[in-house]
Structures are given as structure tokens and as C-alpha cells.
Swiss-Prot record:
Example GO BP: 'de novo' IMP biosynthetic process
PROSITE patterns according to UniProt: GATASE_TYPE_1 (PS51273)
Organism: Bacillus cereus (strain 03BB102)
Catalytic residues of the enzyme: C86, H194, E196
InterPro entries associated with the record: Class_I_gatase-like (IPR029062), PRibForGlyAmidine_synth_PurQ (IPR010075)
Subunit text: Part of the FGAM synthase complex composed of 1 PurL, 1 PurQ and 2 PurS subunits.
Function comment: Part of the phosphoribosylformylglycinamidine synthase complex involved in the purines biosynthetic pathway. Catalyzes the ATP-dependent conversion of formylglycinamide ribonucleotide (FGAR) and glutamine to yield formylglycinamidine ribonucleotide (FGAM) and glutamate. The FGAM synthase complex is composed of three subunits. PurQ produces an ammonia molecule by converting glutamine to glutamate. PurL transfers the ammonia molecule to FGAR to form FGAM in an ATP-dependent manner.
Phylogenetic placement of the source organism: Bacteria, Bacillati, Bacillota, Bacilli, Bacillales
Keyword annotations of the record: ATP-binding, Cytoplasm, Glutamine amidotransferase, Hydrolase, Ligase, Nucleotide-binding, Purine biosynthesis
Enzyme Commission code(s) on record: 6.3.5.3, 3.5.1.2
Associated pathway: Purine metabolism; IMP biosynthesis via de novo pathway; 5-amino-1-(5-phospho-D-ribosyl)imidazole from N(2)-formyl-N(1)-(5-phospho-D-ribosyl)glycinamide: step 1/2
Protein known as: Phosphoribosylformylglycinamidine synthase subunit PurQ
Amino acid sequence: MKFAVIVFPGSNCDVDMFHAIKDELGEEVDYVWHDTENLDGYDAILLPGGFSYGDYLRCGAISRFANAMKAVQKAAEQGKPILGVCNGFQILVESGLLPGALMRNENLKFMCRTVQLRVENNETMFTSQYEKDEVINIPIAHGEGNYYCDEETLKQLEENNQIAFRYVENPNGSVSDIAGIVNEKGNVLGMMPHPERAVDELLGGAEGLKVFQSILKQWRETYVVNA
């Protein structure tokens, strides 16, 4: 399986994402610059955290216009797994690939610590290796991670089982304790916590690795078993 890590000016978690795939998952991965127009050679696309384009205007607001995002849109339409973490989640929302918005944290402070997440839906291509309602420890590092959507959108997210992760103790004011959501099709996941920073016990825990293992399992079942 071959992954692409999209690198924007200001990305700073791309190396962590690359390490998670190459060294921990053991799969092929490339850094792909934001001006690429073709992602056809990749099986999964990863949008890392950071401060793309300095987070001017709004987090992710400029990145949505990058050439690579047109290719990401195409990959999403093809059903390829798209994972956006932290700033990557913000970019997915700004691009319209996921509903809602990310606002300033409720306390107006940047937060950097490990939090507990509850797996709300373990039937997605990103969460199949977890147990339903499993509680996992994953780091956060954001100033604008307060997820917001209107009541109608929240109702749709809940009815369609699109809420992948919730905070056990809400750190930022996110509506309904939401930490991560998938699109209706189930192949695009956005989450504020950083699973790529929790893939090695030496780094404090490996509970984030199952996100990437789930993607790999889905790909093998779809393309290797059926080959």
C-alpha cells in the first residue's frame, strides 16, 4: 500500500506522519508537495497537522485552494481513504469534504497534552481495529480545535453514525464532545487529536497506530484478497 503525505507551507507534523507509515506500519509513503495535481499513484492520502500558510484568514482557509486539494477531492470521490489530522481536519472542513467548522478553543488557549477519546464507531475503515466504546489516549496540540456544527448537521452526523471519536472529557468546547468525524461515504476522516504521535510505546503509547492499521486492513481486504 502506498501513502501520500501532503506537505503545505507551514506543515510541521508531516515527519511524524511519515514515520508512522514507514517505520511503524511498514508501508510505502512519499512526501507530496502542495502544488501536485495528480495523486493517482497513491492508495491513501494523509493531511498532517501544522500551521499551513501561517493559518492566515482561518486555519486551512488558504490551503483549500492548493492544487493538491483538487487531487484530494478526486481521490475522495474515488473512495480512497483520506485522513486529515488537526490542521488537516481544518483543511478538510474548509474544502467541504467534511461538514462543520473548527473554532478557537473555548478557553482561548493553545492546548498541548494527552487526552482520552472514546471510539464511537468502530465500523469505519479508520477504526475497525478498535473496540466499540474503547477508550484510548491520544495527544492533542491545537488552538482552534473547537468543533462546531448546527443542530441539523449534528442530527445527521449522529443518525448516519459519522462520529468516529468523542472526547471523554471535552478539552476545547467541541459540540457533543466531538473529536473526529467521517463523511457520509465513510472514506474521509478528520480528527483534531494526533494518532501519528501515539504509534510507539517509547513515545508514551501506541494507541494511535490502530488508525493506520485499520486503513491497511481495509485496503488489503479490498484490493489484495479480491485480486
